[in-house]
Amino acid sequence: MAVVDVVGLRPTPDRVRETLFSWIEHLVPDLSAARGVDLFAGTGALGFELASRGAARVTLIESNRQLVDQLTRTKHKLAADQIDIVAGDALAVTARWPDASFEVIFIDPPFDSGLLAPALTATARLITQDGLIYIETGTPVEQSLLSRHRLYPARSGHAGRVHFHLLRPQSA
């Protein structure tokens, strides 16, 4: 996949992505009915990977116009009809969506943006009860942040500076 040179763009490392999708396939062996969203799509690697593994629908949200154009070119090159690309602010876009819209949500904002907590707040109502939320951070995530959003880590790992977690909603 071609990558546009954008300041602050930090694609998920291949090793981390392989681990993540191994976890997802273990927890959700059949993705054929899954709907996914990547709130800070960047290169789109996570969303395109989810689509390639059979997800029914994947939405990529990105605010950077250069990246949106690149995502659109990649979608057409791959003939990935199950992918929707939305240009805009992820928090504003998701505010308009109905509850329980997604089985898989990717939240990987720029590390120092302060967007992780607001994104978790915005998506708490969007995830289905058995859904998965992936977060990627530059520092270990605080358990209090997860508890506030009624999430628990199903799997966690780190590779270098990248800390990554696959979260599930707590039962009501």
Locate predicted features:
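Class I S-adenosyl-L-methionine-dependent methyltransferase catalytic core
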Residues: 1-172
